[in-house]
Amino acid sequence: MKGLGGFHLAGRCDDPEIALTLRRRKHRDEKPFAVMCRDAEAARIFCEVSPEEERILSGARKPIVLLRKKDPRSWQHLSENSQIGVMLPYTPVHVLLMEEHDGDPGFGALIMTSANLSDTPIIRENGSAVSGLRGIADGFLLRTRSTS
């Protein structure tokens, strides 16, 4: 999925097999994955979110914020830590993607991880993504807008 600064690999969080497949394909055995939640309310299902953390999450920059999991054992396939990186949608395509799953009781968030392999430059161009991520990504969501 093409974002503002490069490509992400995305997958449902509620299926540990998806996380394991991403780990295997990216050669990323232990590093935690970040997740994208629809909004701060959705993040509260899984995490403790203080007013200050919500302000930062919902701000214009939409950074990844480390939030404390409500249950430290939850989402072990994403992060073995008591915290997990959470971000909110920051492009219209992300918003549409999250809205597509609105009302799906099994859906809470998406894994969002950089599409580049460890120690390789960020992939910014569509052609480079399609050729460089063959065998890693199952599909591609491309757009013509340049990344920054």
Regions found by a protein language model. Give the residues of each.
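Active-site-adjacent structural elements in enzyme catalytic cores
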Residues: 1-148
